[in-house]
A protein has these predicted regions:
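A hydrophobic alpha-helical transmembrane-helix feature that marks the membrane cores
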Residues: 1-223
């Protein structure tokens, strides 16, 4: 979302956005809806994670918001250049990642231990901290040039994208372990919903990161 906001030209009621080298016209109403969807996604995500009683509803609503955002990227951004097939490519890669991690977990090749959870949690906190630094830094005049330079560095964008995908893939192992724990211990329904949402959240996260990486590569040199 920040990348969409960082480079635009307002022309009446229309905004020409630049997303990873893809220039796409966006009407102000669409921009407002998109921003609203992103904000709603954050709210629903937090409620689903921390207010377990609301997970059946907020989890579903979160998935809807992500579906809207994915549709925007595939049909609005890529569709403007007849590259919708890249969305299908991202889906196939995501399915391959999920199947691979499922196999690694089922075969016991990767086991969920306290050390594994600690490493994953540390990586997740690092990712969140880096994202917050990037977002906040963009609005600070002193750090904005550095943030913009980092975001427009192709090699850095690709490397960070791959790292994020690896971290998200490892989170799948934790999700599988959580589901096993809930089922084997016959925990209450609310835990089943939370486990299901956790898995859905991770899969959507992987897809968006894979799609963003593909868009970054496809859009390289279009600026």
């Amino acid at each position: 979302m920040q990348r969409i906001a960082e480079s635009y030209l307002s022309t009446g009621s229309r905004i020409d956005i630049n997303y990873e080298g893809f220039k796409v016209p966006l009407y102000s109403t669409e921009a407002i809806v998109l921003i609203g969807v992103v904000i709603a996604a954050i709210v629903f995500q937090l409620l689903a994670f921390f207010a377990s009683a609301t997970t059946p509803v907020t989890g579903a609503l979160y998935s809807v918001t992500q579906g809207y955002f994915i549709s925007f990227l595939v049909f609005k951004v890529l569709g403007a250049y007849d590259l919708e097939y890249l969305g299908a490519m991202a889906l196939m890669i995501t399915v391959l990642i999920v199947l691979t991690m499922s196999l690694l977990y089922a075969k016991g090749i990767i086991r969920v231990t306290k050390k594994f959870k600690m490493v994953i949690t540390t990586l997740f906190i690092t990712v969140i901290a880096a994202s917050l630094f990037s977002f906040i830094g963009y609005f600070i005049p002193f750090t904005r040039p550095m943030i913009v330079a980092m975001q427009h560095n192709f090699a850095l964008s690709v490397i960070s994208g791959v790292i994020f995908i690896i971290i998200a893939a490892l989170f799948l192992i934790c999700d599988f372990d959580t589901i096993d724990h809930v089922v084997n211990n016959k925990l209450p329904k609310k835990y089943e919903w939370q486990a299901a949402f956790g898995l859905a959240f991770t899969v959507l996260w992987i897809y968006l990161k894979v799609l963003d990486l593909i868009i970054t590569i496809a859009g390289h040199g279009r600026d």
